[in-house]
Structure formats: structure tokens, C-alpha cells
Regions:
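Helicase P-loop NTPase motor core of nucleic-acid translocases
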Residues: 1-162
Length: 162
């Protein structure tokens, strides 16, 4: 069973990087995953909980995804506007972010395709982690922009002469 008593979890909340809803969403996913598919070791559960909760929290801040590469490289980039990168809570989250190099984070997430995959609650595309519903919305926007870019709109000759 998941303990969910990791100190960095309270630090995420304190910094405004997650809400109770984010934590409960991820804990629910992990519990279903453990019951139906595989038992997770405590360190695997902690790793997944951290990154998936952070992703959900970024969506709550208005971002469409979590840029994992940026988070690993510049932890302060995750902070909500007006939050200063100081204090014990920030140091705890920064330490957790830097516990695994970027490539290991990607491998760790890809190792659990029932949680992070095309048909899973979370989708990994390149270095970005999405809640599945937002990954499809972003793709639809990209396709719409590409279609619009291919349409040749007539421009009146007098406008071209100016």
C-alpha cells in the first residue's frame, strides 16, 4: 500500500505546485495500477507520485503540460508567479527534481505504460508530460494551425502595391 507520507508532498503544496485534487488523482491512479497490474516498490511509487503530481499541478496553474527537461534543469521555472525560489520547501522540491537526471526520469516514466502511455491517464511526448485529455487538445490545435497555413487567401492587388 502507498504511504503518501513523503515530506516533499507537503512542500509541493506549500509552494503552490499541487493541490489536494492533484495528489488524490495520482494516488488513485497508482492504487488502481498496483491492484490490477503490478506491485510497485516504495521508491518507484514515490518517483511516479512526484512526477505525475507535478504534471497535474502544472495543469492547475494553466500550463498544458510539464516540461520535464526544463524542470530538471531549472526547478525555479515551475514556481507560480510571485513565488520566490527560497526556503526549505523549495530546497526539498529542488532536491527531488534533481534526484534523477532527465534521461532517467523519462525511462522511469516509460517503464509504466499503463500510467504513462498513449491510452493511459498521462502521456509522454518527447520531454513533455501531459494529462491525456490535454495531449489530444494540443495535437488538434497543431493540426488546425497546419491546415490554416496551407490555405492561400486572396490578397487584393492594391494592398500588395502598398
Amino acid at each position: 500500500m502507498l504511504s503518501a507520507n513523503w515530506p516533499w508532498l507537503e512542500s509541493l503544496r506549500h509552494l503552490g505546485l499541487c493541490r489536494a485534487l492533484d495528489r488524490h488523482l495520482v494516488l488513485g491512479c497508482l492504487r488502481v495500477y498496483q491492484q490490477q497490474i503490478q506491485t510497485l516498490k516504495e521508491d518507484e511509487a514515490e518517483f511516479l507520485l512526484f512526477w505525475l503530481t507535478l504534471c497535474s499541478g502544472q495543469v492547475a496553474q494553466g500550463h498544458i503540460c510539464l516540461d520535464i527537461e526544463l524542470a530538471c534543469r531549472e526547478p525555479a521555472s515551475l514556481l507560480p508567479s510571485g513565488t520566490l525560489p527560497y526556503g526549505m520547501a523549495y530546497q526539498e522540491v529542488k532536491q527531488q527534481l534533481q534526484a534523477n537526471p532527465f534521461a532517467q526520469v523519462l525511462q522511469g516514466l516509460q517503464a509504466h505504460p499503463q500510467l504513462v502511455g498513449p491510452q493511459a491517464p498521462f502521456v509522454l511526448r518527447g520531454h513533455r508530460l501531459y494529462l491525456r485529455r490535454y495531449a489530444s487538445v494540443e495535437q488538434q490545435i497543431i493540426e488546425f494551425i497546419e491546415q490554416r497555413a496551407q490555405v492561400q487567401l486572396p490578397v487584393p492587388v492594391p494592398v500588395l502595391a502598398q
